[in-house]
Amino acid sequence: AIHFLLALGLTLSVTNCFAQISKEQAKERKALVKSSKSELNEKATKTARKEAKKLIKEGWKSAPGALPLEKQLDKSYIMQMEYDEDMFPKFIMAEAMSIGQNYDAAKMQALELAKQNLAGQIQTEVTALIENTVANKQLEPEDAASVVQSISAGKSLISQSIGRVIPVVELYRTTSNKNKEVLMRIAYNATMAKTAAKKVVKENLEKRGDDLHEKLDKLLGW
């Protein structure tokens, strides 16, 4: 199985119903924000080379017409290392794999699965953003809990709200029974991700007669 490197802080632990970024992850994100473009490129290239060796050993190849495997990974890690001043990723990343009798069918299924995983990543990152407003005493814990509940219940709605994604990595390999296995890694613009989450939260809160979404507009710039 292929996994993102945990060191890049894409996996957040959940505590007290909030997705919290660990001190180590927050520290790394701050360091990445302060890094120069050349430093980020160097770090991304180093990480990409390491993963490329692993993937090639496992039989993965670049899709026809796509960039070389290492170049795709390089681009992926550069995008993963970009954060704004609130430590929110500039791109939400997700990936998935699928096996099919032909390449196109496997690719389509992998893309759909990646979008579902993307919805989960959006949930995680936006929940962490909400938790941060509580830490900064901008939002009361009970209000935050209400918002988090809306986000947690809305994964399928977030998934439906996702617009155009950016395919960043597209690899394939042939299985022992001649089927095609495709790996897709996609990226989604952070602004669009927040918009997708906002829509779900707003609709949920309005159904309950809660005007909390107006406060979120001011606090989070939604």
Range-by-range predicted roles:
Residues A19-W222:
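Domain-level marker for long, solvent-exposed, non-transmembrane regions
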Residues A1-H3, A19:
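Positively charged n-region of N-terminal signal peptides that target proteins for export
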Residues H3-S13:
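Bacterial N-terminal signal peptides
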